[in-house]
Amino acid sequence: MNKELKRVSIVVLLMFLALFGSSTVIQVFTADTLRADGRNSRTLYASYSAERGPILVDGQPIAESVPTDDEFKFQRTYTDGPLFAPATGYFTLNQGNTGIEGSLNDYLSGTSNSQFLDQVNALLTGQNPKGAAVELTLDRDIQQAAWDALGDLQGAVIAINPKTGAILAMVSKPTFDPNTLAGHDTDQVIAAYDQLLADPAGPLFNRTLAGNLNPPGSTFKLVVAAAAL
């Protein structure tokens, strides 16, 4: 091999190595970041074109995806949205996900590693992937009772099973309706989000988790007060 061909071969080899290295970096190290980028329309359409798993309370859906005729194929809907908003959070086009919708997004979207076999089956059969259902420990009757007891007051109520630690009620007021943030009209979603964000009452703040907003009441204070009397 003469010197010219040898130089060309080396250059071509270096180009292939550079291409292989860059593709490896993208697919292995930055894939999650790119998928999570809000400007990634491919991921956005893919997440809405799949049937997202329901969120259940007492076996009944409080959040589910229903078929639509537009390009997104499914619409996320919330039953008794304001009542369960502190738990479900919201699933939106461009404002991210919160609550269970965010923390268990991998399961609800069907992309969790534990659902790998389901993903392979969907790929081989050509079927649309489907997310897993998530059952909450909330009790609808206790949740409603906590909601009614709080009334128009600002604050939060949490009821916990002392034996298991299961959360039976999770109410925060003022609250919001996640249905207003789950639409497919981007302008309407942004307007609704900005309005909620600008509300001085802070309906987007989950007071059951944000302890700096409302300090928890101490049951022991009742004992001290009784002793003082």
What are these regions (language model features)?
Residues 1-156, 170-213:
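Extracytoplasmic/periplasmic proteins that interact with beta-lactams or build/remodel peptidoglycan
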Residues 87, 146, 165, 209, ...:
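Active-site SXXK
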Residues 141, 160, 220-223:
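An amphipathic alpha-helix/helix-turn recognition signal
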Residues 156-162:
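Surface-exposed patches in mature extracellular/periplasmic domains of secreted proteins
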Residues 162-163, 172-173, 219:
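An acidic- and aromatic-residue-enriched active-site/binding cleft used to recognize and process polar
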